Amino acid sequence: MKTLVFGGKLVNEGATRVASVVVDGDTITDIIEGTETPRGDYDSIVDATGCFVMPGVIDCHVHFRDPGLTEKADMETESRAAAYGGVTTYFDMPNTKPQTTTEEALNAKFEDAAKKSHVNYSFFIGATNDNIDCVTGIDPHRVPGIKLFMGSSTGNMLVDRQDVLHELFSKATLPLMAHCED
């Protein structure tokens, strides 16, 4: 599907200018300067005159509580709300039930998100005192990082052993996102 978004105030690379954007499928294929409506064969045309056209937001720290705590929120409702607010991608935290601390739990979340999510997604894998080989061996293209709880929090994922912390800090090739207390 080829879409033309025309006449909007394009915000990109530190500048704002009136331009039109051509999107083919899910890829921006052209940016056309000026206020004239570009000619072409489009499946959909959006008049963005007077509106801002800008990149979507990436929310790198969400708690959608899915699976296991869905009385609070779930992937479908929260990703829908994210889309309405201009968030195009989210990274969900691992302190769910079950915790996302194994490759199997991570795979299950990806499979669930493929069915429920309205926007792009990824998931942090959580470190524990017992899963260092798993989190340091995870494919870095699958997850944005490793969540490390250094204080008690939802899900009781506290990593409190000095030997484990040393090994994690030494071996991790992914960014560590630490929840620090004390």
Model-based region annotation:
Residues 1-4, 9-55:
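Histidine-rich, glycine-flanked metal-binding segment
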Residues 2, 15, 39, 84, ...:
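Alpha-helix termination/capping residues and helix-transition junctions
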Residues 27, 33, 62-64, 95, ...:
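Short, glycine/acidic-enriched loop or turn micro-motifs at the edges of active sites
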Residues 45, 58, 146:
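Receiver (REC) domain switch-region micro-motif
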